[in-house]
Amino acid sequence: MNARIDAVDADLSWFSINAEAYNLGAADADQLVPELGRRGLFRIGVPQSLGGDGGATFDGVEAIAAIAERSLTAAFVFWGQRTFIEYLLQSPNTQLRERWLPALLTGEFAGATGLSNAMKFLSGIESLQLRATQHGARWELDGRLPWVTNLRKAGFIVAAAVERSDGATPMVVALTDSQQGVARSADLDLVALRGSNTAAIDVSVADIGPEHVLHEDARSFCPGVRPAFLSLQLGMSIGLARVALRTAAQHGQGAHRILLPRVGEVSAELEQLVGAVRDGLASRRFVAEPAALFRIRIRLAEIVQSALGLELDASGGRAYLRDQNRDFARRWVEGAFIPVITPSLTQLQGELAKQAGACKA
């Protein structure tokens, strides 16, 4: 376990015990954020001067990975909350940060990243889904965010990139569930991770002003936060792969010992990629070279699938018996989510192919 997690709270067993219930949506989804906050996990990688425990963004990646080893649903929620916190840390709007950061760090309130659409917009994959019409110093917002996680029913704040009707540079705003014109849908009918408070947001004639603006220039802000957005997300892949490989090694006895060299090879490559994430964040390489992070994301997703396959092979028929190994069945469907989380593997592969084509032209 990461040293910073050990220093905060070593008792993460609650997430293991409740993993199946949250995956199936059979537990109170609103309890996840307070449980994560109670253990001080949202403070990891946040400057002490702002109420955090210090450290770097990579410490947050490792914290999410530690939770993902126990429950991908909890890690998914953790990613949404911690990523919104990162937006506040990088926003020039100090009043917005001062208002919301304390409650987000403690887990009293939920933060959600609605910037998946913006990240795809940066790559020319899709247009922005919210539109702002200016009225004096304020704007009127309309549109829909079809898939957002950590929309806690007890209350949430969500970041979104907004196209301006006058053609000015898109901006990034923060909306709350209590604002008139902001409506949360019922939970999406997910195959797994059903306790993640994942839903759509409809926005109709919602009034916002300067107090809601995270950044006036989405084209400047989003590339700057993208390394944290993606790297924190990679914590889910890292944690899921680690627990699958560790289980494969534990079960790799007798006739299954033939798998151990392959388990070792995949584990070594996994940790090499983890080191590349750490170094890329520290050097800020991913700001100037996002393609390097895209390639890591793609390879980590492939490693998750390999790790789960090795766990299955090492466990044998036991993996297919619910009364003997429920964790594997849960991890198998959790793993199916890794390739499709935004930006999906096909979207990243398309972006890399487009960049390669541009270089050849």
Label each residue range with its predicted role.
Residues D28-R38, F42-D142, T149:
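Glycine-rich flavin
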Residues G239, G264-E271, F294, I298-Q305, ...:
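Generic structural signal for well-ordered, non-transmembrane alpha-helical segments
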Residues S16-L24, Q253, E271-Q305, G309-D323:
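C-terminal helix-coil-helix/basic helical segment that borders enzyme active sites and/or dimer interfaces
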Residues L188-E271:
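Glycine-rich beta->alpha junctions and the first turn(s) of the following alpha-helix
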Residues M1, D9-A19:
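Generic N-terminal amphipathic, Lys/Arg-enriched alpha-helix
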Residues W147-V182:
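A short core secondary-structure module
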Residues P227, L234, L259, F286-E289, ...:
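Amphipathic alpha-helical coiled-coil segments and their boundaries
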Residues G317-A361:
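Glycine-rich phosphate/cofactor-binding loops in nucleotide/flavin-utilizing enzymes
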